[in-house]
Every structure is written in structure tokens, then in C-alpha cells.
């Protein structure tokens, strides 16, 4: 990685695969092409769609290991990039959450210190303002907007490289955050997916570093009513640095990731069924990929677009139960890119870094039609 400090969103249905079924990848009609260049190369940043249709790109890490305060807006109407007022505090490995009123809550992260500060972006002024703080500093946490407007922050890494099992609820109306029940284990590089009914599914992740790392196959569910976590089934393969999205039928697709060595990447997927509380094997991708959290998009027609972690993006065709390669692609297997969907179904892929730890200024657009 560029920095050792950061090691630290029609109905879909899948037939349950037979044990000996082979999932193949063919070529989809859609394509990806480069459309713009960022003012600053960045990875471990965030990309958030605004009510105007623009994409807000916040912070991230540089190739030299620094953290960015710079912020850019991508205008999809002409594929242009515009600078906006910077963050008060440079940060990477933070979260950015779009509120119903169009503001964006940027929380936590790292810039040489683990951060607890929160800044809120107002698209009407193009500026950030301070908006309270987390209960404790955290980087690499997950952030999930709940139906009642509060944000659940779970896990991550805190001061002194402490892996966190704690969670907290932040209220944007008051700028205050409060602790809730903790997860069963400390987690970083996990995923958090909002389920129907307002519960949040936490999957996988790890604690520890290098030879002391433990990667989890466990999952748990947070209930806003009880403010506690409970067990929620077990993955067939322990994984971290993966991605997860809710499908149109309410199940959750868990994608890719890696083992504890970070040398074995997965092309496998698993599907969590909230009705049974169990995971089952899903279709496999053509390419193994990891460091992909937040880069998988469910398209308007229910297909699933997996964008980064490999040179070729893939589309999951639900009707045929297979992944299809997307034409065009990326120049490298970008890690920690940031991805957002546009109105009408197009998808924008930004930044990331390659296997040589070079951060990218690239902006690519998947054309949905």
C-alpha cells in the first residue's frame, strides 16, 4: 500500500448453484471509458452523489503517503471537474454519508492521527462546516444511514492501532454521537449493509496486523430498536477488504476480498438470506479482486456492476446467473477507488492506486443503456 498507516453503495434472483456448476464470464454490451482527470491523484477517498447530479470527491491519500484536504466535484453533464472549498482537516479512510436534505456528513479517518472530527458539506454553499465529533477516533469504520436519519458508525481502527468493536449513533440534527452496544469482535475492512426493516448487516473484516491478523467468517446484525448486535450466520470463506450490496429481493451479495496473507484474492461471492439467516454460495467472477469496499453498484435494472480491483469490470446477469466482462476497462487493478452512481444508471469510477502503489487521477464512466 502507499502507506502502512492505512491498512486500515426488475427483481434479482439467483438459482442456488449445484456443487459442480461452472460460472462463466462473457462480454456485456455496456462499456467503460475514461472521461476526465482529477486535479489531485487520490485513493481511499469518498465519492458521493449530490442532489444536483454532481459527484462530490473528498480527501484521500497521496502517492507519497500524505492525506488530502482537497475536494472536487464531477459534473456528469460535460464530464468536467471543479474544485470546491477544502476540508478543515485532511483525511483518508473516512466515511461520507448523504443525508436526505442533500448535505454530506464526512466523519473520522486518518491523517497521521486517528480522527474523531465530523464535517458537513452543504451543496448550496460548496463549503464544509464543523458538525460535532465521534465518541472516539476511528479510521476505516463503516457508516450506515438509518431510516430515522441517524448514522451508525461501526468498528475501524483507533488511537494506537487499536481495533474497535465499538459502535455509535450520530444524529445530524444535533451534531451529537452516542455509544451503542458493541460488536462481538473488533472489525476493520468489514462491510455494513442496510437491510429492509432498518437493520444493518455487518460481514467479515479483520483485526490485527501481519502475522497476528485474524480474518473473520462471522457476521452480525445491528437492531436500531435494541441498539445491540446479534449473530447473523457464517460465511463459507473468511474474508476482508470485500464488498457487499443489497439485491432487489432483499438478499445481500458479498463479493471478493482476501485471506489473512493479503496474497490470495477471491473471485467468489456469497449470498446472505435474511429470511434464513444463512449464507450460500453465489456465482464466481472471472477476476479475483480485493480492497473494493463501496465500489459495487446495483443498476436500475437489478444487475450488479463490480467496478474495481481488476482491470476489467464485470456485470452480474441475474437471469443467467453469471458475470459478464464489461468492454473497455481500467488501466490497472485499482485498489481503494471511489465509485458513485449517476441518475439514469451511469456509474463513475475515480482514483485508487495500482500494484506499484501509484495513485490515479483517472475518472471513468460506465455507460448504462
What kind of region is each of these model predictions?
Residues 1-8:
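Bacterial N-terminal signal peptides that target proteins for export
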Residues 8-17:
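Bacterial N-terminal signal peptides
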Residues 19-369:
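Kelch-like beta-propeller repeat domains
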Amino acid at each position: 500500500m502507499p502507506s502502512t498507516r492505512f491498512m486500515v453503495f426488475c427483481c434479482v434472483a439467483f438459482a442456488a448453484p449445484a456443487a459442480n456448476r461452472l460460472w462463466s464470464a462473457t462480454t456485456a454490451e455496456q462499456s467503460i471509458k475514461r472521461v476526465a482527470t482529477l486535479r489531485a491523484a487520490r485513493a481511499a477517498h469518498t465519492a458521493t452523489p449530490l442532489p444536483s447530479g454532481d459527484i462530490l470527491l473528498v480527501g484521500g491519500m497521496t502517492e507519497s503517503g500524505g492525506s488530502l484536504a482537497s475536494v472536487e466535484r464531477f459534473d456528469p453533464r460535460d464530464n468536467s471537474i471543479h474544485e470546491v472549498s477544502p476540508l478543515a482537516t485532511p483525511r483518508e479512510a473516512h466515511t461520507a454519508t448523504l443525508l436526505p436534505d442533500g448535505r454530506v456528513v464526512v466523519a473520522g479517518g486518518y491523517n497521521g492521527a486517528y480522527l474523531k472530527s465530523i464535517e458537513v458539506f452543504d451543496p448550496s454553499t460548496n463549503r464544509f462546516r464543523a458538525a460535532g465529533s465521534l465518541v472516539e477516533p476511528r479510521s476505516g469504520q463503516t457508516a450506515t444511514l438509518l431510516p430515522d436519519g441517524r448514522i451508525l458508525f461501526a468498528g475501524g481502527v483507533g488511537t494506537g492501532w487499536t481495533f474497535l468493536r465499538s459502535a455509535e449513533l450520530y444524529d445530524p440534527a444535533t451534531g451529537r454521537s452516542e455509544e451503542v452496544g458493541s460488536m462481538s469482535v473488533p472489525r476493520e475492512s468489514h462491510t455494513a449493509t442496510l437491510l429492509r426493516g432498518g437493520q444493518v448487516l455487518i460481514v467479515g473484516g479483520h483485526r490485527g496486523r501481519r502475522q497476528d491478523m485474524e480474518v473473520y467468517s462471522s457476521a452480525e446484525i445491528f437492531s436500531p430498536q435494541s441498539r445491540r448486535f446479534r449473530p447473523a450466520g457464517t460465511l463459507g470463506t473468511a474474508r476482508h477488504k470485500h464488498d457487499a450490496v443489497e439485491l432487489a429481493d432483499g438478499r445481500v451479495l458479498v463479493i471478493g476480498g482476501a485471506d489473512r496473507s493479503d496474497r490470495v484474492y477471491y473471485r467468489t461471492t456469497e449470498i446472505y438470506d435474511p429470511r434464513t439467516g444463512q449464507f450460500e454460495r453465489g456465482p464466481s467472477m472471472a477476476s479475483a479482486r480485493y480492497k473494493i469496499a463501496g465500489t459495487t453498484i446495483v443498476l436500475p435494472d437489478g444487475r450488479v456492476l463490480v467496478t474495481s480491483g481488476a482491470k476489467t469490470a464485470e456485470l452480474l446477469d441475474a437471469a443467467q446467473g453469471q458475470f459478464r466482462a464489461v468492454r473497455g476497462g481500467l488501466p490497472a487493478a485499482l485498489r481503494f477507488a471511489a465509485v458513485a452512481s449517476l441518475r439514469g444508471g451511469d456509474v463513475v469510477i475515480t482514483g485508487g492506486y495500482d500494484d506499484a502503489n501509484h495513485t490515479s487521477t483517472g475518472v471513468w464512466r460506465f455507460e448504462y443503456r
